[in-house]
Swiss-Prot record:
Protein name per UniProt: NADH-ubiquinone oxidoreductase chain 2
Organism: Strongylocentrotus purpuratus (Purple sea urchin)
Enzyme class: translocase
GO cellular component: mitochondrial inner membrane; respiratory chain complex I
Family designation: Belongs to the complex I subunit 2 family.
Bilayer disposition of the protein: Multi-pass membrane protein
An annotated Gene Ontology molecular function: NADH dehydrogenase (ubiquinone) activity
A GO biological-process term: mitochondrial electron transport, NADH to ubiquinone
Function summary: Core subunit of the mitochondrial membrane respiratory chain NADH dehydrogenase (Complex I) that is believed to belong to the minimal assembly required for catalysis. Complex I functions in the transfer of electrons from NADH to the respiratory chain. The immediate electron acceptor for the enzyme is believed to be ubiquinone.
Keywords, alphabetical: Electron transport, Membrane, Mitochondrion, Mitochondrion inner membrane, NAD, Respiratory chain, Translocase, Transmembrane, Transmembrane helix, Transport, Ubiquinone
Length: 352
């Protein structure tokens, strides 16, 4: 793909998200979501491999179906109220339709089935886009939607997402599918928090974006596809693999890493609103995340046999990317923030 074409498509993807976030009209929101999706489809299909094309087609079909459902819900809302404004009271039937459409777009259970397969068929950089940037607009809409009094529609899907995110990752050996189920679980944490604090949900979303950006870029740098490959790479680039393990533990919410704030914030608001049983179930779901993240760490770092290096170790430099590359800067900054940013996040709770 030519540079000017890819630049135009990326600008269109960003513009679509900005249109959605800044608009109060349901029709303009639908246009922004479709603009972003249609511009992303050629980007996802840039590899032209059969697996890549299959994942691209699945993504397009799911997004087109959810967009049609969203437009039907918006049309029903406009027919009932005579206005396309998102600020008008929402009917319960149209709210269910809109909630399902937004859940499809972010991969929230029980309509999450497409996300692991799509992410498995894409390169890490394209997977980073659909796991982070493409979820910003639907998530913010869902955050706002939960503030309108329809949070009860989102609590059960969020709880199921947390449990499925833990169960689904237990028996996986493919790195992309582990990232996909982890993303599904984190979507549950974000959405359930938005029912009680919009500002806290936005802070958690920023933390989620930073951690996932770091993890995807590190895996893209190491060219790792399976956990067995990660064990092999650990002997070639031990520092990079150590950073991967730290960021994964941060994504699981292990203190004192940055991801702990994401889980602590959600539990704080749930306990403050006397949802003790719900909090306990979500903790159980997150313990499953801890299990397979720690299992990966043990298998990679603690259970390796000693290796006697006979030749020079200069070949390790082949895995080091140029410090002037944009990915290097983005990966470095996001990795530091993913592991050491707790002191920076604590003052933000003043606004919540």
């Amino acid at each position: 793909m030519r540079q000017i074409v890819s630049t135009f498509l990326f600008v269109t993807v960003v513009s679509g998200t900005i249109i959605v976030v800044s608009s109060e009209n349901w029709f303009i929101i639908w246009v922004g979501l479709e603009l972003s999706t249609l511009a992303l489809v050629p980007i996802l299909c840039s590899g032209f491999s059969p697996r890549n094309v299959e994942a691209d087609n699945k993504y397009f079909l799911v997004q087109a179906s959810s967009a049609a459902l969203l437009l039907n819900g918006a049309l029903g809302q406009a027919w009932l109220t005579g206005s396309w404004s998102i600020l008008d009271p929402v009917n319960e039937v149209t709210s269910i339709c809109l909630s399902i459409a937004l859940a499809f777009k972010i991969g929230l259970a029980p309509v999450h089935f497409w996300f692991p397969d799509v992410l498995q068929g894409l390169p890490f950089f394209q997977g980073l886009i659909i796991a982070t940037w493409q979820k910003i607009a639907p998530l913010i809409l869902m955050f706002y939607f939960s503030q309108l009094g329809f949070s009860y529609l989102l609590i059960t899907p969020s709880l199921i997402s947390v449990l499925i995110g833990g169960w689904g990752g237990l028996n996986q050996t493919q790195v992309r599918k582990i990232l996909a189920f982890s993303s599904i679980g984190n979507m549950g944490w974000l959405v359930i928090t938005s029912a009680y604090s919009f500002n806290a949900a936005i802070i958690m979303l920023v933390i989620y974006l930073i951690i996932n950006t770091s993890l995807f870029l590190l895996f893209d740098h190491l060219k790792v596809s399976t956990l067995g490959h990660l064990n092999t790479i650990s002997q070639l680039s031990p520092i990079s693999v150590a950073l991967v393990l730290l960021v994964m533990l941060s994504l699981g919410g292990l203190p004192p890493l940055t991801g702990f704030i994401l889980k602590f914030t959600s539990l704080y608001f749930l306990v403050a609103n006397n949802f003790i049983i719900l909090s306990s179930i979500m903790i159980i779901g997150n313990l499953q995340d801890y299990f397979f993240y720690l299992r990966i760490s043990f298998n990679t770092s603690l259970f390796l046999f000693p290796q006697h290096i006979i030749s020079s170790a200069s070949w390790r430099n082949s895995t080091i990317i140029s410090p002037l590359a944009p990915k290097a800067w983005l990966s470095s900054v996001s990795t530091v923030l993913s592991t050491l940013a707790i002191p920076l996040t604590l003052p933000l709770y003043i606004i919540t």
